[in-house]
């Protein structure tokens, strides 16, 4: 097998940075997919026997990304080490987020003392960072003062208690008032892009396969967790999750461990943010049941925004759209009544996402009106 091997669990960016630090530009490096090509494993082939007749080519390193495993058939996974050994004589092997069968193959094939397992260290939420987090929430998220205070209190508890188990916080309230934006803002403040899961976009069978792990080549919750860039995970519209799937979250929220068919994920010290449209904690408890609700460490209420806050959003979003337009179109909108109309009717909008869409449609209807008028005249 390889002279030495590193198994890395964590995001691709950090994995690539590690490989770049440890390899030289003039090294002969290959990917695992090149190994598959050399081994002539096609859509329905097994490992060819004549490979042993030719000595494997010596290479300095072999780099295997998590996505590579989705490009091969399932019979390749337990034969991972065998295929590589028969095609290349590898100096150092780097593998990101291998499925359990590949991990087992590597542990069995690598000589003792030549296999290192590296877990990416995600930034923790520390007390000294709470001021910066609160300042970012204040600047990026309008209103929701009580919700922000409850969130900071929950984060303080997470930092002070220093428990390895994950922290689970539920945001509840009407749609389009800043729940998802708050989660995104928090992830940026902690460091890294937010990992967002939307179960409302999945049918029951699709959600089942996503959670339990079906084919290794398909998207899965475990694979997305392994690839996360920050330790903040947003499960959007958790109230839309089929209650029959709740048991998949019990061990995750209790112990910080998630196991499916293909992966075993360490999620200790993670922060899970669950958004929902429940109008109260009582309604959430009734809908979710005591077993699921008791695993939520804190519930943060998001209320409807005030008129002044809605006007601020209107002005900011119109300015954002105008920044994308050329000078002529910008002048047309500035001279129109679009902005004044939305400010006058701000109170009627409860969902800010819907309001922004309406603003954009009003702007582009105004700009496209001459095209429609010209077309009608030519008929």
Task: Go through each PLM region and give its residues.
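AAA+/P-loop NTPase substrate/partner-engagement loops
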Residues: 189-217
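Walker A/P-loop
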Residues: 4-30, 165-197
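Canonical AAA+ ATPase core
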Residues: 90, 97-103, 217-221, 237-245, ...
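N-terminal accessory segments that target, anchor, or regulate ATP-driven/P-loop NTPase machines
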Residues: 1-120
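A short helix-turn-beta junction within AAA+ P-loop NTPase domains corresponding to the substrate/partner-engaging
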Residues: 105-125, 192-194, 286-304
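Pre-Walker A (pre-P-loop) alpha-helix and adjacent loop at the N terminus of AAA/AAA+ ATPase modules
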Residues: 127-168, 361-367
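Conserved alpha-helical scaffold flanking the Walker A/P-loop in AAA+ ATPase domains
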Residues: 44-58, 212-237, 262-263
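Conserved AAA+ ATPase "sensor/coupling" helix adjacent to the nucleotide-binding pocket
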Residues: 110-114, 312-328
């Amino acid at each position: 097998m390889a002279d030495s091997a590193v198994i890395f669990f964590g995001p691709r960016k950090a994995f690539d940075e590690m490989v770049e630090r440890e390899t030289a530009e003039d090294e002969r490096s290959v990917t695992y997919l090149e190994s598959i090509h050399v081994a002539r494993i096609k859509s329905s082939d097994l490992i060819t026997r004549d490979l042993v007749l030719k000595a494997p080519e010596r290479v300095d390193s072999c780099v295997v990304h998590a996505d590579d495993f989705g490009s091969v058939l399932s019979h390749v996974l337990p034969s991972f080490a065998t295929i590589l050994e028969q095609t290349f004589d590898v100096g150092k092997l780097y593998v990101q987020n291998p499925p359990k069968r590949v991990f087992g193959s590597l542990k069995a094939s690598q000589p003792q003392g030549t296999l290192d397992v590296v877990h990416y260290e995600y930034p923790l939420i520390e007390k000294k960072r709470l001021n910066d987090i609160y300042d970012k929430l204040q600047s990026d998220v309008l209103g929701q003062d009580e919700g922000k205070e409850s969130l900071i209190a929950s984060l303080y508890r997470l930092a002070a208690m220093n428990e390895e188990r994950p922290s689970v916080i539920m945001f509840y309230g009407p749609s389009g008032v800043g729940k998802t934006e708050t989660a995104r803002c928090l992830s940026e403040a902690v460091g890294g892009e937010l990992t967002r899961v939307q179960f409302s976009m999945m049918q029951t069978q699709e959600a089942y396969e996503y959670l339990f792990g079906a084919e290794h080549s398909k998207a899965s919750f475990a694979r997305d967790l392994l690839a996360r860039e920050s330790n903040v995970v947003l499960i959007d519209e958790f109230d839309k999750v089929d209650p029959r799937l709740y048991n998949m979250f019990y061990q995750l929220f209790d112990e910080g461990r998630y196991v499916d068919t293909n992966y075993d994920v360490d999620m200790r010290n993670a922060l899970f943010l669950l958004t929902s449209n429940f109008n109260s904690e009582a309604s959430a408890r009734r809908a979710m049941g005591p077993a699921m609700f008791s695993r939520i460490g804190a519930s943060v209420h998001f209320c409807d925004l005030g008129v002044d806050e809605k006007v601020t959003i209107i002005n900011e979003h119109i300015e954002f759209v105008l920044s994308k337009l050329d000078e002529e179109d910008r002048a047309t909108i500035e001279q129109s009544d679009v902005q004044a109309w939305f400010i006058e009717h701000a109170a009627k909008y409860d969902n800010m996402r819907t309001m922004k869409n309406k603003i954009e449609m009003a702007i582009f209807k105004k700009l496209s009106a001459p095209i429609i008028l010209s077309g009608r005249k030519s008929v």
